[in-house]
Structures are given as C-alpha cells and as structure tokens.
Amino acid sequence: IKAKFGTAIAPIVATKADANKAVTVIVDLLHNKAYDAKGECAIPGDMADEVEALRAELMEAAAGADEELMEKFFESMELSAADMAKGLKIGVRDGSVCPVLCGSAVTGMGVDMLMKTIVELVPVATDMPAEKAQDESGNEVEVAFDPNGPTAAIVFKTISDQYGKFSMIKVVRGKVTGDMSLYNPATGNTEKLGRLYSMKGKKGEEIKEICCGDIGAIGKMDRVKTGNTMCDAKNVVILEGIEYPAP
C-alpha cells in the first residue's frame, strides 16, 4: 500500500489470519489491544514482534505531525496512546497521515474499531482550515468553519430518483434550516428551502437542520446545480466548486 500511495500511509491495526486467509484477530496498535470475533483477547505471542515494529512506526508517524511530540518522542522513544492520538489527528487534518484499518461488514470484526477511530482521529469541522472562496467582486476570501456565522454551503452532488431531485450540500458556515431562503450567486436566484434530509443509503430521513460541517440534502431544488454555492443574501460568498477531471 505504501508503494502505491506513499509514506503518509499509517497502519492502525495488525491482523492475524487462519489457513483460509480469514482474519481471526485484529490488534489495535494505538491502544495496544487485540480483538477476535468474541471481543477483546490477548495479543497472540507470534504477533508480538510485528506489533512492536508497527507501533514504533505509528509513533513515528504521530510524532512527525507535531514538533512538540517529535521532541517528546526523541527524549524517550515512546509516546502514550493519548499523545499518539493527538499527533495522528493533526496528521489526518493536514493530510500528512492516512490511517489504514481492517474490518469486515460480513462478520462485523473491526467495525467498532473503525467507528471509534473516526471519532478519535478525524477532526471536526471547526478544526479544519478555512475554505477558499470569492466575494461578489471576485476577490479571494476565506470562509472559516463557524457554526454561528452567516450561512454558506456548497452543493457537491445532485441525486435524481423516483422520489424527485435531491441537492446534497456541505454546510461550511452557519446552519441550514427548512424555513430559510438562501441566495445562489451562480444564478442570482433566491431559493426558498423546504424539506431537509439526512441520507442513509438510498433513503432520506427528514431532519430539521443541517449544522456547520455536516452534509445533508435539500429536496426539489430544480434551479440549483452541482457546484453552486447557497449563502446568506447579505453575506455573499462563492465557494470553490467541484473540479472535474478532463475526459
């Protein structure tokens, strides 16, 4: 994987497989714990050297993301789980670390670990750098993730099915509620919103609001296209649209 995707790859787990190549044990390298199909178990003795080596690599990846952690690591050549998580979270935010996990949707092994890792290592919106944008005059500006700011959202995908058209949005600033009217700088139209949805697979669950950093869907926005910005009419910004690869 590293040969293909580069040194940012950071395995968070080590695995043990049986004769049929089915994974039987997953070791959480961050917390130094092992799990099998029944739950937490002892780390297998024949995995000790591999786990030690991979944990050392993970510590280096975490330390490399933060100068303070790097100094701490060089002093003792060891980092606590909390320090490792801190460094990895910084690395994930900056793109210098790409965690790799293992799991099976069929057996359920590793799924809990994946969910916990997302909570522990993936930064929330307010930790992320500001989004690039333009104002009405075409000047470059930045839009910080601010839950209390004037609303700004980007339409990143459009879905059409037997139930109609859904505009998928990511809220960069403020929040979106169904009783709002938002301005579309691309068309000059003010759009009255209606029902909002949280998409779960192909099904939409109706919700009251989409908060800063969240994604959701707006139904029946016929004049809105993928890449459009939806924003407060008194605070117009144009967020960077989707860059499509050349055919």
Q: How should these model regions be labeled?
A:
Residues 1-247:
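Structural and coupling elements of P-loop NTPases
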